[in-house]
Swiss-Prot record:
Keyword Ribosomal protein: no
Residues where ATP binds: G656, P657, N658, A659, S660, G661, K662, S663
Entry's Gene Ontology cellular component terms: cytosol
Entry GO MF terms: ATP binding; ATP-dependent DNA damage sensor activity; damaged DNA binding; mismatched DNA binding
Function statement: This protein is involved in the repair of mismatches in DNA. It is possible that it carries out the mismatch recognition step. This protein has a weak ATPase activity.
Organism: Synechococcus sp. (strain ATCC 27144 / PCC 6301 / SAUG 1402/1) (Anacystis nidulans)
Keywords attached to this entry: ATP-binding, DNA damage, DNA repair, DNA-binding, Nucleotide-binding
Protein name from the UniProt record: DNA mismatch repair protein MutS
Length: 882
């Protein structure tokens, strides 16, 4: 940043130096010299420098902060020869709010805080140190986190087509690692995680710092890493195998990584070690305790790519990205933040293991049948705070007294929870039948030591109850005795002086004083010492008052320090139990999710699906879980679906009018499959669900302006991905393939895609289309069936029945939809005229009905097809008749 980049209002007032590196250091004031020295070490972060009650920024950081936070940009004298330099500041008590805004915009922040008071300072400057570096992926502060979302930091190592991935949420302690082959899998895993920050090793020395979302990526970052994330480019050294392994072994005090499951996964180890190094560098003394890394494989879970997650609107809507209207919105009846985060993870990682699915079903079934147990459980869970993050802040040394009280209250609920679930039969609920007794003891100890309503600040006293420590009680008694002496001083001095308006007061600047009106000042005794003269007031002190003040202030300082030390001891005690607390928190979160899913199942009338080992998908009277909640009760029209059985089709060609509900039906089937594989009940009268390895969707498309791809090219890319990766155990949901190009081209592509899916892949597929010619496929392939969304035709309009029934539709009623949308009547009339001519002359399917490998058909010659096409084009657009 150059001087010319200074804002105009600063440039006009002789404010110079838009960058601290432009200034000769020996010309700066001592404080500014220290600021510049610290800034040299943190060029890639915004430096927030504590000065009294404010965190200040200077030079280039001040300009950035003022711009991004819309704060007033002012200036400060930096030295006689330097003049004024840019300055912006935020109140120290509002740090979380402003830091959160900067982090959301992709900035990293270095906190340079005062580590001693002015009274403790040995020299002219109060000692300041970097106490914390806040980056998007390393946030611990409660006010900067979303309660029901994880805040993941990820690290990636790539070697050819092989990759290693580690990710952690330092606020909850989650720490996972994986290794696989195929960069597309890495891309999709990052999309699933939505990490706030991604670490990537780079040897380029000039690429340090954060790349914010949307910034152009340097060549060192491969194309498989999406532009939508924030990247921190790191030195390769911590990502070297030996360095990374050693760091993991030392940090977790292990002899090998066998127990973590990654001993034979070198890329996973490198990613995990590089991530741990970054956390140590950024969190310094407040490094949050992490669980030992756990290893997982992509093959353990149903694969949902980014396209499918978006089309099925699992966590946010496709239209505006809002939570309201998503599947998560429809299901989230969890009572705790931990449960909310876990439900999100379950929805994004459906299971493939039938036994694990059935275990969840068993717990939900028990909670559905025992309504009293379910309601009591949910009421109790509502009183439990976020055990994961509370214990994490305690372990990191950042928890305040209110955090520990919330933790204590939650820990003391656990025995009650164990008693409530003592009669539970399902293994997932039985996990909470035994609670470690030391957690109840810890909760008792915290409640007995901390006052009921402690302040947020830890260094100003008022934290610890009386009776906890003898020394504390003695100090309090001394302070109280001296304060009572001062309180009685006003009455005794009024009597002694005869001045009834005399008052005893206190100010931070001058301490305790005796106040008199100036008209009475000549009546004061000789031992009064004048301290301050104001317009209408004189302030005095006495030797006794000064002595008492000194005793009070010294005792209060000692008292505050002792309370703080006792609190730190309590917090340290909690940190020794973090692993145990988090283990029980995992079980509590699971119980919360299971109870929430049971609540939805009961009130929305869901059924328990039969999980099968074959490919069958049989849904009787299925419903869309989100749409039915948005409609009045009973308004949603249920529909059935059968795919993958010996008697049923593998591919359904679904036809019907515009706006009749085809896309809703596709999503409904996909969501029921997904819900079944997270162990949930499903919105249907009955359901048999075979395990699915992957759900593919291609529903709607828009131009990708960022890459210059048209709607049709986006559609073809997505379709190619499906055809190249689908298996017989996949579920494929396609809507209007081929619509983005010319009619003949689109129909040809749609036919070929449907034929390939049914004949070659044999994936369970629903193929929604307006190409009614595709109904011919059912006569050529035994595993294809035609279904339609029905309408009722009235003389002047049509009524959408939203019922899916066997058979193919021969009309789309697009002109009727256009009329309902309000197109001018002359346009509608002309469209009907053109349509009648097309229907009269069209033989588009002549080539498709003949051939296609069928022994019952003969192949049409090119000349026949050309003649047909020419006939169709004659007279269609010759103008309206009169």
């Amino acid at each position: 940043m150059t001087t010319s980049e200074l804002p105009e209002h600063l440039a006009k007032h002789e404010v110079r130096y838009a960058d601290h590196r432009q200034v000769e250091r020996d010309r700066l004031t001592p404080m500014m010299q220290h600021y510049a020295e610290v800034k040299d070490q943190h060029l890639q972060q915004i430096l927030l420098y504590r000065m009294g009650d404010f965190f200040e920024c200077f030079f280039q950081d001040a300009i950035v902060v003022a711009r991004e936070l819309e704060l007033v940009l002012t200036s400060k004298e930096a030295g006689k020869e330097v003049g004024r330099v840019p300055m912006a500041g935020i109140p120290y008590h509002a740090l979380d709010r402003y830091a959160s805004q900067l982090v959301e915009k992709g900035y990293a922040i270095a906190i340079c805080d005062q580590v001693e008071t002015a009274a403790q300072a040995q020299g002219p400057l109060v000692r300041r140190e970097i106490t914390r570096i806040i980056t998007p992926g390393t946030i611990l502060e409660e006010g900067m986190l979303q309660a029901r979302r994880n805040n993941f930091l990820a690290a990636v190592v790539i070697a050819g087509e092989h990759w290693g991935l580690a990710y952690a949420d330092s606020s909850t302690g989650d720490y996972w690692t994986s290794q696989s082959t195929g960069l597309e899998g890495l891309t999709q895993e990052l999309y699933r995680l939505q990490p706030s920050e991604v670490l990537f090793p780079s040897a380029a020395p000039d690429l340090a710092g954060l790349l914010r979302p949307g910034q152009s990526k340097p060549q060192q970052i491969p194309d498989c890493l999406p532009d939508s994330f924030c990247y921190a480019l790191r030195s390769p050294m911590p990502f070297e195998l030996h360095e990374a392994r050693q760091r993991l072994l030392e940090h977790f005090q292990l002899r090998s990584l066998e127990g973590c499951g990654c001993e034979q996964l070198p890329l996973a180890i490198r990613a995990a070690g590089g991530l741990l190094d970054y956390l140590g560098e950024t969190q310094r003394e407040s490094l949050a305790p992490l669980q030992k890394p756990r290893t997982y494989s992509l093959s353990e879970f149903l694969i949902l790519d980014q396209q499918t997650r978006r089309n099925l609107e699992i966590t946010q809507t496709q239209r505006d990205g809002s939570f309201h209207g998503s599947l998560l919105w429809a299901l989230d009846r969890t009572m705790t933040s931990m449960g909310g985060r876990l439900l999100r993870r379950w929805l994004l990682q459906p299971l493939l293991n039938p036994e694990a699915i059935r275990n969840r079903q068993a717990a939900i079934q028990e909670l559905c049948q025992d309504g009293r147990l379910r309601q009591d459980l949910r009421s109790l869970l509502q009183k439990i705070y976020d055990l994961e993050r509370l214990s994490g802040r305690a372990g990191a040394g950042t928890a305040n007294a209110r955090d520990l009280l919330a933790l204590a209250e939650s820990l003391l609920r656990l025995p009650e929870l164990a008693q409530l679930l003592s009669r539970a039969q399902s293994p997932l609920l039985a996990q909470l039948q035994q609670v470690p007794p030391e957690l109840e003891q810890l909760g008792d100890r915290l409640q007995q030591h901390l006052v009921e309503s402690p302040p947020l600040q830890l260094t100003e006293g008022g934290l610890i109850r009386s009776g906890v420590a003898i020394a504390l009680d003695e100090l309090r008694q001394q302070v109280e005795s001296d304060r009572q002496w001062i309180a009685s001083l006003e009455a005794s001095e009024r009597t002694a002086t005869g001045i009834n308006s005399l008052k005893v007061g206190y100010s931070k600047t001058f301490g305790y004083f005796i106040s008199l009106s100036r008209s009475k000042a000549d009546q004061v005794p000789d031992h009064y010492i004048r301290r301050q003269t104001l317009t209408n007031e004189e302030r005095f002190i006495t030797p006794d008052l000064k002595e008492r003040e000194s005793r009070i202030l010294n005792a209060q300082t000692d008292l505050n320090q002792l309370e703080y030390d006792l609190f730190v001891g309590l917090r340290s005690e909690v940190s020794h139990h973090v692993e145990t607390i988090r283990a029980i928190a995992t079980a509590v979160a699971a119980a919360d999710v299971l109870a929430a899913l049971a609540e939805v199942a009961v009130y929305q009338n869901y059924c328990c699906p039969e999980i099968r080992d074959d490919r069958q998908l049989a849904i009787q009277d299925g419903r869309h879980p989100v749409v039915e909640q948005a409609l009045p009760s009973g308004f949603y029209v249920p529909n059935s679906c059968g795919l993958g059985s010996d008697r049923g089709p593998d591919l359904i060609v679904l036809t019907g009018p515009n706006a009749s509900g085809k896309s809703c039906y596709l999503r409904q089937v996909g969501l029921i499959q997904l819900l079944a594989q997270i162990g949930s009940f499903v919105p249907a009268k009955n359901a048999q669900v075979g395990i699915c390895d992957r759900i593919f969707t291609r529903v709607g498309a828009v131009d990708d302006l960022a890459t210059g791809q048209s709607t049709f090219m986006v559609e073809m890319d997505e379709t190619a991905n499906i055809l190249n990766h689908a298996t017989a155990r996949s579920l494929v949901l396609l809507d209007e393939i081929g619509r983005g190009t010319a009619t003949f081209d689109g129909l040809s592509i749609a036919w070929a895609v449907a034929e390939y899916l049914a004949r070659e892949i044999q994936a369970r597929t629903i193929f929604a289309t307006h190409y009614h010619e595709l109904n011919e496929l059912s006569g050529l392939l035994k595993n294809v069936a035609n279904f339609q969304v029905t309408v009722k035709e009235l003389p002047d309009r049509i009524v959408f029945l939203h019922q899916v029934q066997p058979g193919g539709a021969d009309r789309s009623y697009g002109i009727e939809a256009a009329r309902l949308a309000g197109l001018p009547s002359e346009v509608i009339d002309r469209a009907r005229e053109v349509m009648s001519r097309i229907e009269k002359h069209s033989r588009i399917a002549v080539g498709l009905r003949r051939g296609n490998g069928s022994q019952r058909r003969t192949q049409a010659s090119p000349q026949q097809i050309d003649a047909t096409i020419a006939t169709e084009q004659l007279g269609l657009f010759s103008g309206p008749s009169h």
